[in-house]
């Protein structure tokens, strides 16, 4: 799912010629009171810009948050993953599975260390070192801590990852907690809802 298309490639696909793009950048440079020689420099920087990497981890969840985003209309899922972000890992909709999926996750975290957005849906079970929910033999709590190290920010999608949700309800047999109870040193944005939809 890793995207390699740059903004320059997308503009070319839309029929914007390199000449027109350079002219636009030179005009923009002059409007910003920069010398005309900055036009090509701006063009190179813009054309090489990649979409932000997104790693989406599902923990104790029902997949309702993922289902809700696959049915979104503004933007559509296609626009989101092909034009706005590079959805490098999301096991529900990705083709890879097993060891291949684990390799994709490891590569995405390594290649984008410090720059990727980490999206989490589902609460994190803590009882018995998180053994009640594992992916690829790794507990959710260990996976979250590892992925959070290289994340620029964490986005909690749904009430479960934001506040613990249904898994945290009494008697809470897995000792489910929200992401913020585990990760304290990263910016976290909570988007609660079950699922988070606009109406």
Residue ranges and their predicted role:
Residues 20-43:
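N-terminal export signals
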Residues 1-16:
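N-terminal secretory signal peptides
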Residues 150-199:
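Catalytic cores of enzyme domains
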Residues 66-68, 129-132, 165-170:
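Short acidic, glycine/serine/threonine-rich loops at helix termini
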Residues 138-151:
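Catalytic-core regions built around general acid/base machinery
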Residues 69-75:
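Short Gly/aromatic-enriched secondary-structure transition segments
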Residues 44-46, 50-53, 60, 64, ...:
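Metallocofactor- and cofactor-centric catalytic cores in central/energy metabolism, strongly enriched
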Residues 55-57, 157:
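Short hydrophobic segments within beta-strands
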């Amino acid at each position: 799912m890793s995207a390699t298309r740059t903004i320059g490639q997308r503009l070319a696909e839309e029929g914007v010629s390199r000449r027109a793009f350079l002219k636009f950048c030179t005009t923009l440079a002059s409007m910003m009171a920069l010398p005309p020689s900055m036009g090509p420099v701006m063009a190179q920087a813009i054309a090489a810009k990649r979409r932000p990497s997104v790693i989406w981890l599902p923990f104790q969840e029902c997949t309702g948050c993922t289902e809700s985003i696959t049915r979104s209309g503004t933007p559509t899922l296609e626009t989101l993953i092909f034009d706005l972000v590079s959805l490098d890992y999301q096991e529900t909709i990705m083709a890879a599975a097993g060891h291949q999926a684990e390799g994709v996750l490891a590569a995405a975290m390594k290649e984008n260390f410090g720059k990727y957005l980490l999206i989490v849906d589902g609460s994190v079970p803590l009882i018995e070192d998180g053994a009640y929910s594992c992916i690829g033999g790794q507990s959710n709590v260990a996976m979250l801590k590892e992925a959070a190290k290289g994340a620029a920010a964490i986005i909690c999608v749904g009430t479960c990852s934001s506040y613990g949700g249904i898994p945290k309800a009494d008697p809470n047999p897995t000792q489910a907690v929200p992401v913020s109870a585990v990760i304290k040193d990263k910016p976290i944005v909570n988007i609660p809802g079950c699922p988070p939809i606009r109406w």
